[in-house]
């Protein structure tokens, strides 16, 4: 069959046509493949491998297309139970033996906790049975049969005091499984490992065990700097033959591992727990240089090349000091000196000068000075290259003054050294003393039952009336609308679980926990309501009230929750301009704990009761009863406590109600200053408010503290100073009269920017990059902060997972700045760079030269663990033990009460009664609820039983008007819309649900 060509009379066969199409397609595919391959040869923006573009492209393409990630989650320190293990029987080496036993138990428990199996190399006879590699080298090995098993797919390779004897680490690493080792890695060149002496000669450790054997072995540098290592990959005989053609052209299979170490044993600081986590398996050409940088494990060489017969070892202490241990080979005498001192002494011209300098530095021990002089004597000084054992970094920890903890227990990591020495501390949230002390300091000690005078009550009533405006017949949102607004993944998950139980009354119980965030004092308590039904049903009212009343035109000048950063910045600058910069910053001290039940009843509750239709009043009051008087227990520890009547941070009412209390205090102060003015005029003078943060006119600077005390509150007032900017919502406005540029509160940010609280199974590089990328969005132009973030991204970026991998984690945005998650970023303008820098200098008290030096240091850093910490002159730590002892004002007359509460709560199920407790603080309240559930439907205290009301509300799905499809809008006295000037918000810019705090 033939096909006619459109032009002309020529004809071609179908076969010829198909051949032509195939040829053209094949050529196109070849050209496409060549272009893709050629792209791998691109010139990188950083040092790259040698060779030509073709070899670079070849190596990069093979690595990229063959990389296989290995997912393993393992953190053995979660199973650490004691850092000072003891043995009952003393066999001559009781301490070191107890540490070894504890290490074996820790390893076994941590492997079992993640569902793995153990594959041990030459195990102890007392070790558990299982797969193993057991050769007979020591007499003790004869206690078990010879075995040479193959590790299982879920195996963890374990070695206890055996790694020194392996010929090369690849013997352990080639299986591409985690390796866990308990090893001896000394921080000094001789001395005692607990009760066993050791020396070093010819780079071999001579270790003598009292009541045991003597061992001579080298030491692998597991604890050296560098977090990634490479190894060969073990293959079966079948795989080896199948891969033979690939090996003939120079391809080899390589595995990469991340190496960790810690020194958890207090009595044996020279003992280390080392564990490696496999990361990737790749193929690469062994005859082409690779651009993946890893370190190579090697034996530690203790000999000082510049001083024959001497050993030298550098290490970093827990106090971030670089020390040098020096001593003769094979001798027990050794001394330790700061490296900077030894560097200085090494350059002196005479031994007399060395002695004089040592005495001048306070070293008067003859043995100490003699050892230094003996080390100095002899040859020309050359700076040696010696191994350095780096310490694993630990965040600064907040120790409660009543703590019984032996070691810090925090769920946080540092990804660099602190930027400032007075950095924030992490709370020990796993310790019940931390929870107990936070309850006392943030609830019990600040409980407020003050009842204001008649005059103050009248002012508050006027404020509520003006805040509500014309709205008197609101309807709550429907259940469907509320579910749609509660759009956080965790909320949606909980709502799906209880969707068929929405008609059930919510449970009355608070489960509280310490917030895992850095701070300078006792950690905050999150008082969460575990029953999502309570959150759902209260949110029906809070969301409707916020949408219609609080965001109405008459409140928009002062009510700021729900605005995006640009709207907040514009509003603040407009307010400051209207006041001619005569403004003050207000910040309440522990507003949540100090709000009284009177304020909640007569401001927040009254406002909602008067705004909604009468048929919803009972339901609103019942919810407020629950918030004020609900019983509480510690979620982690189980003990019950009196939560007080203050605001509960996990309630949907927290942010809107706190903002209302804030505004009411200022309205009271304005009334004090202008008693004859019309209330409507004073209401229009209220400044921006959001939670406990606020801005006010300077005319009330003296009266606002008096107004706060009338309600039993404490307030801190700062007058606007152009040199340090204006702070609102933790953002500093550098010059609100001229620009909307803001920066993150610099001192607060610098104190905590080096910390991450992400899950420890997430690689540190990933957590660091995720965290600083958020700050680079909100503070891309902020001096010092942006420079630090760029440094972290530059140094951690190459080792971090791909953006696709990081985006798949649900916790990706956990540590992003709050405002980045609210559909907006704060405005910053390049022309304000100098202003931002000057404000930062004033607020941090770091002079300009030091700021410039830090910025230069960040730009030049090649290792994230280089020392960058700026020494702060003062410490802001409170209620804790700091590095110098008890922090100022941390121990006072409250200490006996703290200790008493701690001892009482040590037994879960008991709680200390409080005389000022709420109405529902009976000691048997929780058990009573259990009895109620056993007898029939669960009923909240003080609420009418199900079915006793008119059936229109009472917390269940309501019929009629509440099941509508839209948000109601209030009507004015004449039937017209009262909010005609307010345009509907744009898509994606709606006021955010206020069920959580900022």
Swiss-Prot record:
Bilayer topology: Single-pass membrane protein
Compartments reported by the entry: Host mitochondrion outer membrane
Start and end residues of each stretch annotated as Interaction with host mitochondria outer membrane: 1-67, 233-250
One of the Pfam families matching this protein, by short name: Noda_Vmethyltr
Annotated stretches, region: Capping: 91-282
InterPro entries: DNA/RNA_pol_sf (IPR043502), Noda_Vmethyltr_dom (IPR043647)
Any Gene Ontology CC annotation: host cell mitochondrial outer membrane
Basic residues compositional bias, start-end: 971-984
Keywords: Host membrane, Host mitochondrion, Host mitochondrion outer membrane, Membrane, Multifunctional enzyme, Nucleotidyltransferase, RNA-directed RNA polymerase, Transferase, Transmembrane, Transmembrane helix
Entry note: thermal dependence: Optimum temperature is 30 degrees Celsius.
Predominant subcellular localization, coarse grouping: host cell
Molecular-function GO terms, alphabetical: RNA-directed RNA polymerase activity
Keyword Transmembrane helix: yes
Region (Homomultimerization) residue spans: 1-400, 700-800
Region feature Disordered, mapped onto this chain: 901-998
Cofactor note: Highest RdRP activity at 1 mM Mn(2+).
TM region(s), chain numbering: 17-34
Effect of residue 692 to E: Complete loss of RdRp ctivity
pH dependence: Optimum pH is 8.0.
Other information: The viral bipartite genome is composed of RNA1 and RNA2.
Swiss-Prot/TrEMBL domain comment: The N-terminus is important for both membrane association and mitochondrial localization. It may also contain a RNA methyltransferase (MTase-GTase) capping domain. The C-terminus contains the RNA-dependent RNA polymerase domain and a structurally disordered region at the very end.
Record family assignment: Belongs to the nodaviridae RNA polymerase family.
Description of how the protein assembles with itself and partners: Homododecamer. Forms 2 stacked rings of 35-nm in diameter, arranged in a crown-like structure at the opening of virus-induced replication vesicles. Interacts with protein B2.
Record-given protein name: RNA-directed RNA polymerase
